[in-house]
Amino acid sequence: MMLVELLSGVISCVCALLAVAFFTLLERKGLGYFQLRKGPNKVGLMGLPQPLADAVKLFTEELVKPTLVNVFPFLVCPAMSLFLALVLWILYNNYFVCSMGGLSMLLFLCVSSLGVYSVMGAGWFSNSKYALLGSVRAVAQSISYEVSMSLILMSCLLLVGSMSLSMIMKYQFFVWVAFVNFFMMLMWFVSCVAETHRAPFDFAEGESELVSGFNTEYGGVGFALLFMAEYGNILFMSVLVISLFFGGVVFVGVFGMGLCVMVSFVGWLFIWVRASYPRYRYDLLMYLIWKSYLPSVLSILMFLVVSVYILNG
Amino acid sequence: MVTILIYLLILLIINVVLLLLGLIINKRSYSDREKNSPFECGFDPSIHTRAPFSMRFFLLAVIFLIFDVEIILLLPLTSNILNSNTHWPLTSSMIFLTILLIGLFHEWNQGSLDWMK
């Protein structure tokens, strides 16, 4: 049993790495077509092997270590952020995959909070002004949205009475939580976009203000690892959007392919949002979470607690 | 538990191998003073690279700390409310959430949530 669990975790982690590679291709292609151009189409057949070429290029690229950098933590931070992004994938529930035990969402909360440290370290140990400013912004944004995210997560788990992701997916066999918790679902998606520092909330690397934000000093392998971690987080957030609010799809389709299709669609939504909206304003971002989401999430949570208690008898 | 530990170990190995791979096969090249200085637009960086930042960010972290502790206290509620026969999970969580909400409105009223004054 243990071996099977371990094997399924490792397989979903390796598949996640592959998915990350091709998700970057999807993003470049998609953004290309949004802007009425082709995107990468020269490598191989229609640009399909492009991610592999990118990987080779990034790993063989020269590694610049600026003199002021604290070298060891500077190199460890990207590896740590990829590590944390991949740890989450053991929670992935597919048709074939046996999930981890009853406290999987607790593991998610812990690991996703730790992700802040790698961003903070990447900025701080770079010893550069742009990197520091970018990482400070990124940390403030992440921790703010973490509050509302954990409360929304709790509102979903409340309906099931368990902290296990596989349990909440099983409970949605007949009806989706999205029907009960519709506004929570919308808020969860926006929080996910903000938590992963994606456009329109990409203040961690606002190109026009800070050169590239917290990863300004990175190139080569460091940049590659940070990039993979970011996209791994995006894909896992898409998985969570589907698992928490549309969990029943794991039973739909041949071998549960419904889940993969829905997750790809949510991943596509991240790109779509990026192509459609201009960058938000930082103070508005903070108002959105503290003055709008947090009071409404707390109120809805109170309502849910009472209704669950009454309906439970 | 053991499964997760072994999984973490495997991931650690994957990450270290990726990092070492990048460190070993990267293209060597010359390095000079300009190239190795932190990225700033064409001039030498001043000494204070780790510049002081706005107090807002620190205050935000303090507020976050309070809310995060409260979330930790709320987490057991998820399994208690369905699995208990008494009204205590309901009553205590309602009192707790009300205090949390009033606390948030108090912060708002006092202006600690305002990003720009």
UniProtKB/Swiss-Prot annotation, chain A:
InterPro entries: NADH_UbQ_OxRdtase_su1/FPO, NADH_UbQ_OxRdtase_su1_CS. Coiled coil: none annotated. Belongs to the complex I subunit 1 family. Disulfide bonds: none annotated. GO terms for biological process: aerobic respiration. It holds the Pfam family NADHdh. This is NADH-ubiquinone oxidoreductase chain 1. GO terms for molecular function: NADH dehydrogenase (ubiquinone) activity. It is a multi-pass membrane protein. Its EC number is 7.1.1.2. It comes from Heterololigo bleekeri. The chain crosses the membrane at residues 6-26, 71-91, 105-125, 149-169, 173-193, 220-242, 255-275, 293-313. Keywords: Electron transport, Membrane, Mitochondrion, Mitochondrion inner membrane, NAD, Respiratory chain, Translocase, Transmembrane, Transmembrane helix, Transport, Ubiquinone. Its main location: mitochondrion. It catalyses: a ubiquinone + NADH + 5 H(+)(in) = a ubiquinol + NAD(+) + 4 H(+)(out). Core subunit of the mitochondrial membrane respiratory chain NADH dehydrogenase (Complex I) that is believed to belong to the minimal assembly required for catalysis. Complex I functions in the transfer of electrons from NADH to the respiratory chain. The immediate electron acceptor for the enzyme is believed to be ubiquinone. One of its GO terms (cellular component) is mitochondrial inner membrane. It is found in: Mitochondrion inner membrane.
UniProtKB/Swiss-Prot annotation, chain B:
One of its GO terms (molecular function) is NADH dehydrogenase (ubiquinone) activity. It catalyses: a ubiquinone + NADH + 5 H(+)(in) = a ubiquinol + NAD(+) + 4 H(+)(out). The chain crosses the membrane at residues 4-24, 57-77, 88-108. InterPro entries: NADH_UbQ/plastoQ_OxRdtase_su3 (IPR000440), NDAH_ubi_oxred_su3_sf (IPR038430). It is a multi-pass membrane protein. Keywords: Electron transport, Membrane, Mitochondrion, NAD, Respiratory chain, Translocase, Transmembrane, Transmembrane helix, Transport, Ubiquinone. It is found in: Mitochondrion membrane. Signal peptide: none annotated. It comes from the Eukaryota. Its EC number is 7.1.1.2. One of its GO terms (cellular component) is mitochondrial membrane. Belongs to the complex I subunit 3 family. Core subunit of the mitochondrial membrane respiratory chain NADH dehydrogenase (Complex I) that is believed to belong to the minimal assembly required for catalysis. Complex I functions in the transfer of electrons from NADH to the respiratory chain. The immediate electron acceptor for the enzyme is believed to be ubiquinone. This is NADH-ubiquinone oxidoreductase chain 3. The gene is ND3.
